[in-house]
């Protein structure tokens, strides 16, 4: 997949940042060191510094564009290019022997194939706390329509099957992480965001969940000049406008998030 766009991702930074604040608020212990898995453009680092000003921090992300943006925005921070699976296996920039008191991740693990099976290994890299949130909206109209439109002609031959990301319910995450010596707090929240402007749901999902589809269409257009991306945006945008009608105050978007905080017992 082509790289992410930090600018597009940050268009709704307040709405995207809110779950991270809720996640951080549920961390009970004070870490001396923090690893942020999937740190993105570094826009959430201030929340960590504000909560734990003396902690050492490392942000990891698999996107070169995101790491470049994070380093430019926060030159005093440490941001490294790394894959979540490498970190779980102890092959990343943070040696397994060093670990971190807090390993935290916001809206990243849903992109990792087999992330449910990877959770115990990720938790093992945390000396005190492993905390994460993932979007739980993959059955929402936005994502269902993405699969339907992308799965129809003429897009399906270009983008291939659109995967439904395997995100579990809070009870499932509790079951996976509740090993001896761990205390787990798992919950879910549905936010109702009010998005301004024209086609805001299309702009929202185009920066995140629709990325694999859009990158495939853009690559095809670059090679063949077919204009499939514009046609897809028109068809998908029309379906989203019907599913998420604009009101006088903006366009409401219900967005479910699932959280888990696993803490080693004292």
Spell out what each predicted region is:
Residues 41-43, 166-266:
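Conserved Class I S-adenosyl-L-methionine
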Residues 90-102:
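A short acidic, Gly/Pro-enriched loop at the edge of an enzyme's catalytic core
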Residues 102-115, 136:
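A short SAM/SAH-binding and catalytic strip from SAM-dependent methyltransferases
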């Amino acid at each position: 997949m082509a790289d992410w766009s930090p600018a597009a991702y940050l268009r709704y930074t307040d709405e995207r940042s809110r779950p991270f604040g809720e996640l951080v608020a549920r961390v009970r212990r004070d870490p001396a060191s923090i690893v942020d898995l999937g740190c993105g453009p570094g826009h959430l680092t201030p929340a960590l510094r504000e909560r734990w000003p003396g902690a050492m921090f490392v942000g990891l992300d698999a996107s070169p564009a995101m790491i470049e943006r994070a380093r430019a925005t926060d030159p005093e921070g440490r941001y490294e290019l790394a894959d979540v699976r490498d970190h779980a296996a102890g092959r990343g920039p943070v040696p397994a022997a060093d670990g971190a008191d807090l390993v935290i991740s916001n809206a990243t693990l849903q992109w990792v194939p087999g992330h449910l099976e990877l959770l115990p290994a990720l938790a093992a890299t945390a000396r005190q706390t492993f905390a994460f949130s993932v979007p739980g909206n993959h059955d929402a109209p936005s994502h269902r329509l993405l699969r339907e439109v992308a799965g129809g002609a003429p897009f399906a031959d270009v983008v291939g099957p659109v995967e439904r990301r395997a995100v579990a319910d809070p009870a499932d995450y509790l079951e996976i992480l509740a090993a001896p010596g761990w205390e787990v707090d798992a919950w879910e929240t549905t936010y109702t965001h009010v998005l301004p402007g024209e086609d805001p749901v299309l702009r929202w999902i185009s920066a995140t969940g629709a990325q694999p589809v859009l990158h495939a269409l853009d690559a095809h257009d670059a090679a063949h000049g077919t204009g499939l991306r514009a046609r897809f945006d028109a068809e998908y945008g029309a379906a989203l406008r019907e599913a998420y009608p604009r009101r006088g105050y903006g366009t409401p978007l219900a967005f479910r998030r699932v959280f888990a905080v696993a803490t080693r017992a004292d």
